């Protein structure tokens, strides 16, 4: 046992500085005597690497952190390594607690870290030739092989360390350092920006690069909790973590080319990752730069997406949200190009459609978009024709989109103020070429709510044929009160 003396002294020292540590004799026992096991030699032969893994050095490594391993941890380690011949333990080289000088507070270790530190130090001394990466791999494999009982002491120690850490650093907040070159975008993930989700601001930047004529602020991007019923007033800035990626950051990483380039060609953004709720009206109005056919590849094969969940692929092709009161703001994002260009010239302050209906916006839970901001010229055109919204839809291939929202249910469009039992939008025949026919956009000053102009009992008859050619005919003007 004289070989073990230095080792004993070490454990005793550590026990003294360890808060509430049990008496040194206990630690000596646990450190010095391997648990008697009949299969000692077997274990050594079958698991030579494992046997060497944890025990003596845990303490040393621990030493560099200010916490020492309590007896239970050492016992657990020696339990895992039982059968190991302790006379082989060399006198470990003491490392001065270097971290004491550093102000940087480390995170409390989790259970695996507790185990790995305890084991690694010992093994590193034991097998100096072992490469650290190999060591880590082996430790990880070993940890996965441990059963709950063997892991428990490490888990408990980790919990103790966490509580202790909380006491020592009550205002500690984990702040990972931002590394410059991490494998594609891991640093962003650490910083809380979802990598799977392209920032709407980045999309907007890409779209804006070529179209100077859409002028309005970035803060139009809307996030879920924002509709708080104000009927006029500036739009609130985005609050969700999703949008706080700096707008200039090339967030379109997955396309593999910088933003400046992607602005030049019609930008190829991966529409599967875009949440339509966060596209601002500028983005939607600039969307004419896209080739409509580019959307086709993202259309679901049978045209039956869930109304709210699969909007992302269309990035602004439809402004329909699946919450009951979303429709007032939802409008035809697909306008003919002439109308969009007309709309994009600098205009007097535009009223965004979705902020006007203050009563119903109380109940909006999901993300909404401020859809096409119709310019005053549009409003005045449509004040005379009291029929819903005749836009020139013929310039888009609507056959791609006409079948994509068949699942809208009657309950979603009931508006308490204007109907008792009539549903605002009932897909009586399950066709939805009537999608746009129900929204009449009047001047906000004269119409506080969006009511159907034709009597709502007429609405069920609106859905016409599925074939897109009929969009050109002014079929909507025939809707008058019976």
UniProtKB/Swiss-Prot annotation:
Cell location: Nucleus; Cytoplasm
Domain of life of the source: Eukaryota
InterPro entries: HMG_box_dom (IPR009071), HMG_box_dom_sf (IPR036910), Sox_N (IPR022151), SOX_TF (IPR050917)
A Pfam family of this chain: HMG_box
Tissue and organ distribution: Expressed in both male and female gonads from after metamorphosis through to adult stages. In the testis, expression is restricted to the supporting Sertoli-like cells. Conversely in the ovary, expression is localized to primary oocytes (at protein level). In developing limbs, expressed before chrondrocytes form (stage 52 tadpoles) and throughout the cartilaginous anlagen until stage 56, after which expression ceases in the enlarged cells of the diaphysis.
Region listing for PQA, in residue ranges: 63-103
Cross-link Glycyl lysine isopeptide (Lys-Gly) (interchain with G-Cter in SUMO): where in chain: 61, 370
Biased composition (Polar residues): 42-52, 211-220, 308-326, 351-366, 458-482
Post-translational modification: Sumoylated. Lys-370 is the major site of sumoylation, although sumoylation at Lys-61 also occurs. Sumoylation plays a key role in regulating formation of the neural crest and otic placode.
Motif mapping: 9aaTAD 3: 433-441
Region of interest called Transactivation domain (TAC), as start-end residue ranges on this chain: 366-482
Keyword Nucleus assigned: yes
Alphabetical list of SMART domains matching this protein: HMG (SM00398)
Region (Transactivation domain (TAM)): 224-308
Chain location of the short sequence motif 9aaTAD 2 per the record: 291-299
PANTHER family per the UniProt record, alphabetical: SOX100B, TRANSCRIPTION FACTOR SOX-9
Function of the protein: Transcription factor that plays a key role in chondrocytes differentiation and skeletal development. Specifically binds the 5'-ACAAAG-3' DNA motif present in enhancers and super-enhancers and promotes expression of genes important for chondrogenesis, including COL2A1. Plays a central role in successive steps of chondrocyte differentiation. Absolutely required for precartilaginous condensation, the first step in chondrogenesis during which skeletal progenitors differentiate into prechondrocytes.
Name assigned to this protein: Transcription factor Sox-9
Organism listed in the record: Xenopus tropicalis
Underlying gene: sox9
């Amino acid at each position: 046992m004289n070989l073990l003396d230095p080792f004993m002294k070490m454990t005793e020292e550590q026990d003294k500085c360890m808060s509430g540590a049990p008496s040194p004799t206990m630690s000596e026992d646990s450190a010095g005597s391997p648990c008697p096991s009949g299969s000692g030699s077997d274990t050594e032969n079958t698991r030579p690497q494992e046997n060497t893994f944890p025990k003596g050095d845990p303490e040393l490594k621990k030493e560099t952190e200010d916490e020492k391993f309590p007896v239970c941890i050492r016992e657990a380690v020696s339990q895992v390594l039982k059968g190991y011949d302790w006379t082989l333990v060399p006198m470990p080289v003491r490392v001065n607690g270097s971290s004491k000088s550093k102000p940087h507070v480390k995170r409390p270790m989790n259970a695996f870290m507790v185990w790995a530190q305890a084991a690694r130090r010992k093994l590193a001394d034991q097998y100096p030739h072992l490469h650290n990466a190999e060591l880590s791999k082996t430790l990880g494999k070993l940890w996965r092989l441990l059963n709950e009982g063997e892991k428990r002491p490490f888990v408990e120690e980790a919990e103790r360390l966490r509580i202790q850490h909380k006491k020592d650093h009550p205002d500690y907040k984990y702040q990972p350092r931002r590394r410059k070159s991490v494998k594609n975008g891991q640093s962003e993930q650490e910083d809380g920006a979802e990598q799977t989700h392209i920032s709407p601001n980045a999309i907007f930047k890409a779209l804006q690069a070529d179209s100077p004529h859409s002028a309005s602020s970035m803060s139009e991007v809307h996030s879920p909790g924002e509709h708080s019923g104000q009927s006029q007033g500036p739009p609130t800035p985005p609050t969700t973590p999703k949008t706080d990626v700096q707008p200039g950051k090339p967030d379109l990483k997955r396309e593999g080319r910088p933003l400046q380039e992607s602005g030049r060609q019609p930008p190829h953004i991966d529409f599967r990752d875009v949440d339509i709720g966060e596209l601002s009206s500028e983005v939607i109005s600039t969307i004419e730069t896209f080739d409509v056919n580019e959307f086709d590849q993202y259309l679901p094969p049978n045209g039956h997406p869930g109304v709210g969940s699969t909007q992302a692929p269309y990035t602004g092709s439809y402004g329909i949200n699946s919450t009951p009161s979303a429709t007032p703001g939802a409008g035809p994002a697909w306008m003919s190009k002439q109308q969009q260009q007309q709309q994009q010239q600098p205009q007097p302050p535009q009223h965004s459609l979705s902020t006007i209906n203050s009563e119903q916006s109380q109940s909006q839970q999901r993300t909404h978009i401020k859809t096409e901001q119709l310019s005053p010229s549009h409003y005045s055109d449509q004040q005379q024709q009291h029929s819903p919204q005749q836009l020139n839809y013929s310039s888009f291939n609507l056959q791609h989109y006409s079948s994509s929202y068949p699942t809208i249910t009657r309950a979603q469009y009931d508006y308490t103020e204007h109907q008792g039992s009539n549903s605002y939008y009932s897909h009586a025949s399950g066709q939805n070429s009537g999608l746009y026919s129900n929204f009449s956009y009047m001047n906000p000053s004269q119409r506080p709510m969006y009511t159907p102009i034709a009597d709502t009992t007429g609405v069920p008859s609106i859905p016409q044929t599925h074939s897109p050619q009929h969009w050109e005919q002014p079929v909507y003007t025939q809707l008058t009160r019976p």
